[in-house]
Amino acid sequence: MKKKTTGHTTIKDVAECAGVSKSTVSRYINGKIDAISPEKVKNIKKAIAELNYRPSKMAQGLKIKKSKLIGFVVADITNPFSVAAFRGVEEVCDQYGYSIMVCNTDNSPEKEREMLLKLEAHSVEGLILNATGENKDVLRAFAEQQIPTILIDRKLPDLKLDTVTTDNRWITKEILQKVYSKGYTDVALFTEPISSISPRAERAAVYQEMASVQNVNGLVRLHEIDVKDKEQLKAELRSFHKEMPEQKKAILALNGLIMLKIISCMEELGLRIPQDIGIAGFDDTEWYKLIGPGITTIAQPSHDMGRTAMERVLKRIEGDKGAPQTIELEAKVIMRKSL
């Protein structure tokens, strides 16, 4: 199949490309996929991507009435950050009579693209996005249609969009200084794959700068982990613990989800906190104070980031045409006994 490069792509084009009826494509676009076979769903997805299809009711600006619907696209719904940010978005939506359509991408650019196109088809009035770093063409299309789009936590420097985030470099440096001040000489960073995700890249860069100076022999231990692969994580932890056992060891977990996985795997391996390995991480939650000796974390203002992002959406909906803003909210280190 070849991408259509001229003219306006229609539902008929998609149907012909996918080998299905127009009504089947319409049901798919409107989220009514229960009665569509998995094979047809796959073919429709492929046709939409290859034809670069945009639902005409949005592409031509034919909205008859306001939907009062906000799209909130999160990279990982199981991450404590996503849950707290959602609560902040929800509070503002409830206050102003908006509904939320929540989409989870599992950090997949392909799934993110699919979710963005579905939100476009549902006539969302605004979008809050925890981005994968891809699909900039779709986001530009949102901007062309004057759909307010706010980035939360993750930046996309190439796009002129409002962004709500924290100063990742500064707060990462602060927590690492506290780790090293406790006498740790072998500090590792455990993270999900960094790819083009800005907070991970910023935090990892600070770690590499500091570890190259303060770790024994300038050793940089950057572990990129698939959080769904428990055996890989256990193997990485076991290896880190056994290598250079005379050194005082600590781990900085790059987000709340990987911290959860590390704590679980350490328990299974019989590794004690902090006697065997000290730990610290991001995304403070209530249960961190209840685990073992209490976990040292960075408390991100995740809830307030959600509120602030939604407030920016409302200002844009109300007609604010000002230059895009980057709003940095303050994070803080919470010291407990895990170091």
Swiss-Prot record:
CDD domains: HTH_LacI, PBP1_RegR_EndR_KdgR-like. GO terms for biological process: DNA recombination; DNA repair; regulation of DNA-templated transcription. The keyword Repressor applies. SUPFAM superfamilies: lambda repressor-like DNA-binding domains, Periplasmic binding protein-like I. Induction: Induced by galacturonate and negatively regulated by itself. Is subject to catabolite repression by glucose involving the ccpA gene. Residues 11-30 bind DNA. Keywords: DNA-binding, Repressor, Transcription, Transcription regulation. It comes from the Bacteria. PROSITE patterns: HTH_LACI_1 (PS00356), HTH_LACI_2 (PS50932). Residues 9-64 form the HTH lacI-type domain. Pfam families: LacI, Peripla_BP_3. One of its GO terms (molecular function) is DNA-binding transcription factor activity. Transcriptional repressor of the kdgRKAT and kduID operons for pectin utilization. PANTHER family: LACI-RELATED TRANSCRIPTIONAL REPRESSOR, RIBOSE OPERON REPRESSOR. This is HTH-type transcriptional regulator KdgR. It comes from Bacillus subtilis (strain 168). The lineage of its organism: Bacteria, Bacillati, Bacillota, Bacilli, Bacillales.
